[in-house]
Amino acid sequence: MNKNKNIGIILAGGVGSRMGLGYPKQFSKIAGKTALEHTLAIFQEHKEIDEIIIVSERTSYRRIEDIVSKLDFSKVNRIIFGGKERSDSTLSAITALQDEPENTKLIIHDAVRPLLATEIISECIAKLDKYNAVDVAIPAVDTIVHVNNDTQEIIKIPKRAEYYQGQTPQAFKLGTLKKAYDIYTQGGIEGTCDCSIVLKTLPEERVGIVSGSETNIKLTRPVDLFIADKLFQSRSHFSLRNITSIDRLYDMKDQVLVVIGGSYGIGAHIIDIAKKFGIKTYSLSRSNGVDVGDVKSIEKAFAEIYAKEHKIDHIVNTAAVLNHKTLVSMSYEEILTSINVNYTGMINAVITAYPYLKQTHGSFLGFTSSSYTRGRPFYAIYSSAKAAVVNLTQAISEEWLPDNIKINCVNPERTKTPMRTKAFGIEPEGTLLDAKTVAFASLVVLASRETGNIIDVVLKDEEYITNILADLYK
């Protein structure tokens, strides 16, 4: 017997008048992709989502169709027209699903909430085993004020602890939502969202609550784009296990991976772990005559690998140098070396990588440091170069988007590497990430659909990754 489907419904019918962009806000760019692309990727990657329906505003239909086709969102099985109001768009989706079983689970989400965590989708799906309607909400933080809009006076201030702020997704059994809309369309009822329509038309139904997230913001005002971009810059809210299925690493078998700086530290561990998945690996470093600061050196090395393999699928640049000194105490040679390795080298690698990754629709991965958010004393060149790497990653992600090349940057917490030990000496056990953890996380990012993102790897990821590595090295 076939299980009932879990269908994601993405509401992308808004015109974004409050945003003032001159185009629908679902097409606003954040971290190298449109808000809609980010949202679709979340549902596409979710194991429990079987199909996706996009509800589109009529003038946006072709653009959405192009996005779905170009980025291979294979779970999208139809794009339908919405209406003037949100309820019109939901009704359009219900009508399109009239032949589906009543127990089909619908997960309805705003296209302009691109920072949704996948565990919220999972919790909504699970909660529908107990309820026929589920909302996502977070506790209200600010005081709620009931106002008379005519007089602009306060009527009352309710008890804040009893109030939550609604988000999406909202989830329903198809039969329940269909029944609610049958009553709603007869007129006489106002509803601001699908859950409110269920509550007003079917008062006997209990609506369950799933805890939302403060980062699951809706793009409504210009400032929201700024906030969303900052959240994408620092993906601390975004668990690595949400980026991709580990199974996708096995799909990388026989792909060609080049690691610049692969002779020791994180780079060496990337090489070692990649081999466990059957990935063909090449390490480039000074020890085999490759200088990341010399573009000719990189060009020669890439050409030799291509001549042998006839393709390059992934390139990782881990090369770095850290001088733990004040700027004025560094020699000019040390300053130039630091810039050449930490920033110019990244540029050299990106430029040289482009034609190879364009051919394979491959991916590039760089490394930054937590120091990119604020310059650090005693390693001013290093921290400023890492800030430059972040900006370069975000800029190149947009330049490379038409060629379907992914570029991301891993931002590990303090990690136990030979470079760090040389700069800072021996540090207390348990305060540093293991280089293997960062290496595995890097491969997970390479295997994902992500682009233009700065992805944190933190100590709390270590247990999750250590367990996977233990199985891998049995």
Curated annotation (Swiss-Prot):
Effect of residue 386 to A: Has 70-fold reduction of catalytic efficiency for the reductase activity
GO biological process: capsule polysaccharide biosynthetic process; isopentenyl diphosphate biosynthetic process, methylerythritol 4-phosphate pathway
Region of interest: Ribulose-5-phosphate reductase: 250-474
Pfam families with a match to the protein in the record: adh_short_C2, IspD
Molecular function per GO: 2-C-methyl-D-erythritol 4-phosphate cytidylyltransferase activity; D-ribitol-5-phosphate cytidylyltransferase activity; ribitol-5-phosphate 2-dehydrogenase [(NAD(P)+] activity
EC number: 2.7.7.40, 1.1.1.405
Gene3D superfamilies assigned to the protein according to its UniProt record, in alphabetical order: NAD(P)-binding Rossmann-like Domain (3.40.50.720), Spore Coat Polysaccharide Biosynthesis Protein SpsA, Chain A (3.90.550.10)
Catalysed transformations (reactions): D-ribitol 5-phosphate + CTP + H(+) = CDP-L-ribitol + diphosphate; D-ribitol 5-phosphate + NADP(+) = D-ribulose 5-phosphate + NADPH + H(+)
PROSITE patterns named among the record's database cross-references: ADH_SHORT
Keyword line: Capsule biogenesis/degradation, NADP, Nucleotidyltransferase, Oxidoreductase, Transferase
Region (Ribitol-5-phosphate cytidylyltransferase): 1-238
Entry-linked InterPro entries: CDP-ribitol_syn (IPR012115), IspD (IPR001228), IspD/TarI (IPR034683), IspD/TarI_cytidylyltransf_bact (IPR050088), NAD(P)-bd_dom_sf (IPR036291), Nucleotide-diphossugar_trans (IPR029044), Sc_DH/Rdtase_CS (IPR020904), SDR_fam (IPR002347)
Pathway linked to the protein: Capsule biogenesis; capsule polysaccharide biosynthesis
Description of how the protein assembles with itself and partners: Monomer.
HAMAP family listed in its UniProt record: IspD (MF_00108)
Function: Catalyzes the NADPH-dependent reduction of D-ribulose 5-phosphate to D-ribitol 5-phosphate and the further reaction of D-ribitol 5-phosphate with CTP to form CDP-ribitol.
PANTHER family attached to this UniProt entry: 2-C-METHYL-D-ERYTHRITOL 4-PHOSPHATE CYTIDYLYLTRANSFERASE, CHLOROPLASTIC (PTHR32125:SF4)
Family indicated by similarity: In the N-terminal section; belongs to the IspD/TarI cytidylyltransferase family.
Name of the molecule in the record: Bifunctional ribulose 5-phosphate reductase/CDP-ribitol pyrophosphorylase Bcs1
Organism: Haemophilus influenzae
